Structures are given as structure tokens and as C-alpha cells.
């Protein structure tokens, strides 16, 4: 009936603003909570190399670090380069990044192209680097830092074929390179080494060594 329809419309008008406010409050509260702890944000792009992402995330979480998977596409699931779906924790538009946080870029050819195409992420990387914030990238992803000038004067490594995109960097053909606030690595086969390096940097060397032993690292 018309009376029922009007009653339902009145209900929508009264409840929807409350839901909207509640959602905004949750986001703000989440940002405030994140300010109180050092975070690692892994930026997930469609076409990313799944092992490079998850090996590093897994090791950091084992070490007790707070890690969130951030969708640069602002959607719940990331589709990896080999058809593996990965559930994200948060959207890029909703995160709060402190200078003490760490930003991590998994590689993959298509994934790296998507990282480079994300203007919001590019601005965040430049800003974070200017504050001395830690940034890590693996495989093709260091090239996303290179085109932004973040590797200028730094020692760095990457997947073969991307060396010319490490603008201003001194290329090192080794598995993992840390130079100041920037850590880079070569590819899927070095992803565990990258994870252990970040554990050493964010936690301590002893924790990194214990983790290496626990996972039977040769």
C-alpha cells in the first residue's frame, strides 16, 4: 500500500545516514588505531606475483609485525598473475600512513604496470620516501620506484631486464640490497630472503635467524 511505501521511505531516510556515519567512524577509528603501531602495508595489484607477495607477508606476520594487504584497485580481491585470488585487508583510499610504517611492493610484470599506473600510490611513495620512510620492492617493482626518482644515488637490484628503469641507481646483481630506507630484491626465488631481511630491519637479527631456522632455510 501507499502507506507502507511511505513508511519504508521514512525508515530509509532515518537509518541510512546512521549507517553512513557508522562506516565513517569505523574508518576514522581504524586510522587512529594504526597511528599507535608501526604498520607494514603490502600494495596489491592485479597481476602481481603471488609468491613474492605472500612469502614476505607470511614471514613478517610470523615475526609479529602488523601487515595489511592494501588493494590499489579498492576492491576485496586481487587476482594474481597465475590466477590465484588473494583477499585484501583494506582499500588504498582508507589507509593512514605514518613515517614509521613500511611500504612493500610485490612484483610481477602486469602487477608492476598497475602499480605504476596508480597515481595515488605514486604520490604516497614519493611522500613516504621524502620523510625517510622504509620502502621495499621486489622483481619488476623496483622500477616503479626508479621512475619516481626514489632510487637516485641508491644501490638497488631488480629482475633481469628492468635495470635501465632504476633511474639514478647503482645496480647490484645480488638477491637483496638495503641502502638506507630502501630495500630491493630480484624475484620469486629471493622472496624469502627479502622477507628475512625485512624482519631483521623491523625487528632484529636474532628473530630473522630463528625464523630462517624454523622454515628450514638452507
Write out the residue ranges for each language-model feature.
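A cross-family phosphate/adenosyl-ligand binding-site feature
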Residues: 80-89
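Acidic, Ala/Val/Gly-enriched low-complexity intrinsically disordered segments
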Residues: 5-10, 15, 33
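Short, positively charged and aromatic/hydrophobic N-terminal segments
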Residues: 8, 16-20, 27
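Short N-terminal binding/cap micro-motifs at the start of the first secondary-structure element
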Residues: 48-53, 77
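Active-site-adjacent pocket-lining segments in enzyme domains
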Residues: 39-49, 59-71, 88-218
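NAD(P)-binding Rossmann-fold cofactor-contacting core
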Residues: 70-78
